[in-house]
UniProtKB/Swiss-Prot annotation:
UniProtKB keywords: Ribonucleoprotein, Ribosomal protein, RNA-binding, rRNA-binding
GO cellular component, one term: cytosolic small ribosomal subunit
Similarity remark: Belongs to the bacterial ribosomal protein bS18 family.
High-level lineage: Bacteria, Pseudomonadati, Pseudomonadota, Alphaproteobacteria, Acetobacterales
PROSITE patterns assigned: RIBOSOMAL_S18
Name this polypeptide is given: Small ribosomal subunit protein bS18
Subunit text: Part of the 30S ribosomal subunit. Forms a tight heterodimer with protein bS6.
Xref: SUPFAM superfamilies: Ribosomal protein S18
Role of this protein: Binds as a heterodimer with protein bS6 to the central domain of the 16S rRNA, where it helps stabilize the platform of the 30S subunit.
Keyword Calcium: no
Species per Swiss-Prot/TrEMBL record: Acidiphilium cryptum (strain JF-5)
GO biological process: translation
HAMAP family: Ribosomal_bS18
Underlying gene: rpsR
Amino acid sequence: MSDSIETAPVNTPAARRTAVGARRPFYRRRKACPFSGPNAPKIDYKDVRLLSRFLSERGKIVPSRITAVSAKKQRELARAIKRARFLALLPYVVD
């Protein structure tokens, strides 16, 4: 009497998960918000150098999914950029 133990095929999702080490192959860890934390810079409409880091080369506000800014800080950042534009510290469009 031979007890045959069936093993699952290697190409099943469960087998692949254990073979890879239970980690997703293209998983990227979410970056932390650059304005959260102890040494984070304060968002100020007069700090043109800081605000220009969050503008595209065309002068548009870069979305938070690219810059990893939290939703609350993204609203604050957008308000500061718009205020700086109104005061002619930043351009509306770049040629």
